[in-house]
Amino acid sequence: IYTSDHGEDIFDDPRHLFLHASPVPSYYQLHIPFLIWMSDSYRETYPEHWEAVTANKEKNISSSSSFFPTMLDLGGIKTPYRDDSQSVTAPHYVLKPRVYLNDHNEPRPLDDLGMKKQDFQMLEKRNIKY
């Protein structure tokens, strides 16, 4: 699995924003990679994980919500903290609304952040639900 904790602005649009941690995040700060690769031998040994990740690949996955549950699922680790409904390698993955964790550790819905019109246009262009 490859992911990141945040996206980054690198002069991507006419606003010329740079880096991250703006008071109001941009699309580029919110767009976070989440890649899963499985070797042929892993796919053969754990076909249920491959089938689930293939079935979930077009879903609007939130990497921050899914990373930990997916790692526990892939590792076969049993714990009361494991939530397979948020594991993209589980057959019953459930989409949750996207949120942004602000500087006060409070989850906020994306449409309540004061983002600019062009940020919502980019989310829609990439088919990212919010």
Predicted regions and their residues:
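Catalytic domains that recognize anionic headgroups
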Residues: 1-130
